[in-house]
Regions:
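Short acidic, hydrophobic short linear motifs in intrinsically disordered regions
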Residues: 212-223, 232
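C-terminal engagement modules used by replication, chromatin/transcription, nuclear envelope/ESCRT
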Residues: 246-326
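Charge-enriched amphipathic alpha-helical scaffolds
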Residues: 223-257
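Short, conserved secondary-structure transition motifs
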Residues: 117-139
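A short acidic (Asp/Glu
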Residues: 14-18, 37-38, 95-103, 126-131
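Long, hydrophobic/aromatic-enriched structural stretches that serve as scaffold segments
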Residues: 57-108
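A structured, charge-rich N-terminal accessory region that forms the first stable segment of a protein
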Residues: 1-67
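A conserved mid-domain beta-alpha-beta active-site/ligand-binding segment of alpha/beta enzyme cores
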Residues: 133-209
Length: 326
């Protein structure tokens, strides 16, 4: 029998393979802090929803994404074929959501023995092959209580309203030193109580207002404003593009609406990441907190199982650490 190694994405998976880790390495890949992650009766139904969101039709086709997700989950269905399962994950939101999903799935499959967790306080994919395995000294066995807690957090994330998730953000469950902060960071992507902006959107406007006007350096600046950076370039540029292409833009100057194919073409990519951005008058007012983004633009996005629209607009009050539902 062999070992199964699950980690966040391709960079970490490739590095662990290069380091010679003993086992079959599988990247999880899903960007769970983006798009719908609703309650579903089966894992297959959730895969179908996620494939529909993750596919862009050019760089990633839906059938390919669905096949990759199914192949990934098949390793958990066949967990009895592995005498040992290791989970190698990081401290940020991207990883912590993947971690609670995997543990919830393992618990549902009654895998309660020989599951081990490594939670790195930094980024696995940015290490070197000759030092990444040092994180194994952080390894410990997953307990029954951890499986239960992970399932509860995962279920809360998928609820159609965020109240349960906000309650979970008050809890620091044993064995998950980074989960509470990650869940709070997820809630900060809800529209703000007064300005209607997600934290990432607010950080973008703040940085442009202070002279970081090109998308490439802006991406680096916004990541540096995070306690634990979790956004990839596709995620960031999609949010940036939304601020430029909404009905009443907060930013101007972007060369085109972002889609993943932009980064596959050298000419388009260079023009996109070197564009000169500037706040519109509305952008300055929203940043100042005197105008609400949602009063001028449509809201249509997801946080886990919560579909945010102008009619169902859950907000997050960062000062009070609580939800606000107007």
């Amino acid at each position: 029998m062999s070992h199964l190694i699950l980690t966040n994405g391709d960079s970490a998976a490739g590095l662990l393979r290069e380091a010679g880790i003993d086992g079959h390495v599988v990247p999880w890949r899903d960007v769970l802090h983006e798009g719908p992650v609703p309650e579903t009766a089966t894992d297959a139904e959730l895969r179908d929803v996620r494939a529909g969101y993750l596919a862009d039709g050019t760089v990633r086709r839906r059938d390919d994404v669905l096949r990759d997700l199914a192949a990934r989950d098949a390793h958990l269905d066949a967990h009895q074929d592995y005498e040992r399962i290791e989970l190698w994950f990081e401290h940020d939101l991207y990883d912590q959501l993947q971690l609670i999903q995997i543990l919830s799935m393992l618990g549902a499959r009654d895998r309660r023995q020989d599951v081990f967790l490594v939670q790195a306080p930094t980024y696995i994919g940015m290490q070197k092959p000759d030092n990444v395995l040092r994180f194994r000294e952080l390894e410990f066995a997953v307990t029954e209580a951890m499986l239960i807690n992970a399932s509860e957090f995962w279920a809360a994330f998928r609820k159609p309203t965020p109240e349960a998730l906000a309650e979970k953000a008050k809890i620091a469950p044993e064995g998950f030193p980074f989960l509470r902060q990650a869940i709070k960071r997820a809630l900060q992507e809800l529209p703000g109580r007064t300005d209607g902006l997600a934290r990432t959107e607010r950080q973008i406007l703040y940085s442009v207002d202070r002279g970081i006007a090109k998308p490439g350096p802006l991406f680096a600046r916004v990541l540096n404003m995070e306690e634990a950076a979790f956004l990839g370039d596709w995620s960031f540029f999609r949010i940036l593009s939304g601020l430029c292409t909404c009905s009443c833009p907060l930013l101007e100057g972007l060369t085109e609406h972002f889609e993943p194919s932009v980064l596959q073409d050298d000419t388009r990519r260079k023009a996109f990441i070197t564009a000169d951005l500037a706040l519109t008058d509305l952008g300055r007012d929203v940043l100042a907190g005197t105008v609400d983004f949602a009063e001028h633009n449509d809201v249509d996005r997801w946080l886990g199982g919560t579909h945010l629209t102008n009619d169902t607009l859950w907000r997050w009050d960062d000062d009070a650490d609580e939800l606000d539902h107007l």
